[in-house]
Amino acid sequence: MNVGRVVQVIGVVVDVEFEPGKVPPIYNALKIRSEDQDTPTEVPINLTLEVAQHLGNNRVRAVAMSSTDGLVRGMKVVDTGAPITVPVGRPVLGRLLNVLGEPIDGKGPVESDHYYPIHRPAPPLEEQSTRAEILETGIKVIDLLVPFLKGGKIGLFGGAGVGKTVIVMELINNIAKQHGGISVFAGVGERTREGNDLYHEMKEAGVLDKTIMVFGQMNEPPGVRLRVGLTGLTMAEYFRDEEGQDVLLFIDNIFRFTQAGSEVSALLGRMPSAVGYQPTLATEMGQLQERITSTRKGSITSVQAVYVPADDLTDPAPATTFAHLDATVVLSRQIAELGIYPAVDPLDSTSRILDPHIVGEEHYQVARGVQRVLQRYKELQDIIAILGMDELSDEDKLIVARARKLQRFLSQPFTVAEAFTGRPGKYVPVKETIRGFKEILEGKHDDIPETCFYMAGTIDEVVERARELEGSA
């Protein structure tokens, strides 16, 4: 057994000295337990650390995976001889776990035959899959303008309070329930309350037995928040590689992974780079993102919420994330202020598969038509603000009227937000979405007031509302 001693504790970073020639490699897990000590400890200690740096003179610097309260210099530290390993496979389904794969749902231990280290190489290039297929979400604005790639990576970008988590919850509700496959949810540095709500919602919906939930919330040390995404990903990889499944991986929030990396980096004494972020930002992000991929055996489709500090998309954290994604859904505060939810910016959001060869000519033309009308409306807004609507040409007046209808038709009531909106959620198939927007662009509904388009599901619902409005008049 390889045993070292604590020589220094700085917050969540612990320096440990080992005997010459017995220094553990980077990423190895170390344990500090009360029962291993020569003298009894005041509080029971069961702490896991991960080696992050070799300092020379047989010393390593390790990052703690829980609170370092009660540690004193001279304590014995045991090298486990391997990286942090977590249980994977069928016994983990339906469980709520922490970064070390330990259950936190009070349902007893996880009995699994398979354990994987959380640090694993990405699949080699020749094993990666290149097929392109659309993943239907039932959310109109996403299916039309930002179609999701099956087995791809999707990012939801937005500042504080514009609805990232609500969209993630709705996607879990729509895709995980329809999908029937396995879903993994990694809660990285977000609110414990949201995790609790999600757990109970999944339980009530009866999809918990096909879901794994891994949490490292806001109150956890940065080491946990930095590694909990890898724990969730490792569990998803098992089902992709060993069982050939199509797995859904939800990460809320990937920015907290970067933020935790920045905290750890400062504690390790690295020189900060732009805006105070860690110099290894792109490397850390790449190591995580390159593992989230589809192979010939199975796929991982990931949906990642990305917090945008101060609504600045050029901040290094969201900017680094952009490079890895197939679809970027940008949530806009201006659209949220209009009361249009989901507050997706139809002109700023992009998808790699909005291509006539993949989604079809009709879908492509309708999507581009919607964007054209909304772009023209955006250009005309300054003129309207200064001179008023009367100064516009008849053609522009028609564009403005249609754009306002399109804008409202892009809103949709969500099942997970029923308690707040009082409206039942709507799932709209892609075909219905395309038909609805095509009819608005063709001018078939120019006579319907724009209020009828707000928070509607299909175009038939809009027409029905207009009839009711006429009847009551």
Curated annotation (Swiss-Prot):
It comes from the Bacteria. GO terms for cellular component: plasma membrane; proton-transporting ATP synthase complex. ATP binds at G158, G159, A160, G161, V162, G163, K164, T165. It is an enzyme of class 7 (translocase). It catalyses: ATP + H2O + 4 H(+)(in) = ADP + phosphate + 5 H(+)(out). Keywords: ATP synthesis, ATP-binding, Cell membrane, CF(1), Hydrogen ion transport, Ion transport, Membrane, Nucleotide-binding, Translocase, Transport. GO terms for molecular function: ATP binding; ATP hydrolysis activity; proton-transporting ATP synthase activity, rotational mechanism. Its EC number is 7.1.2.2. It is a peripheral membrane protein. It is found in: Cell membrane. Its main location: membrane. NCBIfam families: atpD. Belongs to the ATPase alpha/beta chains family. Produces ATP from ADP in the presence of a proton gradient across the membrane. The catalytic sites are hosted primarily by the beta subunits. F-type ATPases have 2 components, CF(1) - the catalytic core - and CF(0) - the membrane proton channel. CF(1) has five subunits: alpha(3), beta(3), gamma(1), delta(1), epsilon(1). CF(0) has three main subunits: a(1), b(2) and c(9-12). The alpha and beta chains form an alternating ring which encloses part of the gamma chain. CF(1) is attached to CF(0) by a central stalk formed by the gamma and epsilon chains, while a peripheral stalk is formed by the delta and b chains. This is ATP synthase subunit beta. It comes from Carboxydothermus hydrogenoformans (strain ATCC BAA-161 / DSM 6008 / Z-2901).
